[in-house]
Amino acid sequence: MTLTTINLFNNAKDFIIIPAGEVIFEKGGIADYMYVIIEGEVEILIDGKFLDITSDGGIIGEMALIDSSPRSATAIAKTECKLVPVDQKRFEFLVQQTPNFSINVMKIMVERIRKLDALVVSLR
């Protein structure tokens, strides 16, 4: 995400601190929130297998929030993390009122799809 988008959340009062090693959400869980990572690193795992690390300025949990599906992966704090939870109502407000936010979410999702495409090709 760009600095402008990070600044949308930097002064948020509703941040949460997650200690290193704590599960943020689990695969199959209900998606009430996506999270903006203000500080820290989060590991993304599927069935115990490492998929990715997301850090400062990244987002996690957006897919399940967008399509109301169960979580597709587990997220674990690799380091202590400062996260801002974003529920459906807040997400929709940000999408409508802050086009830059929407574009950055799309860019992140496209980047993840490209990584997965490359992985699929490498497995053939």
PLM feature segments, named:
Residues 1-124:
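Cytosolic regulatory regions built on CNB/CRP/Popeye-like sensor folds
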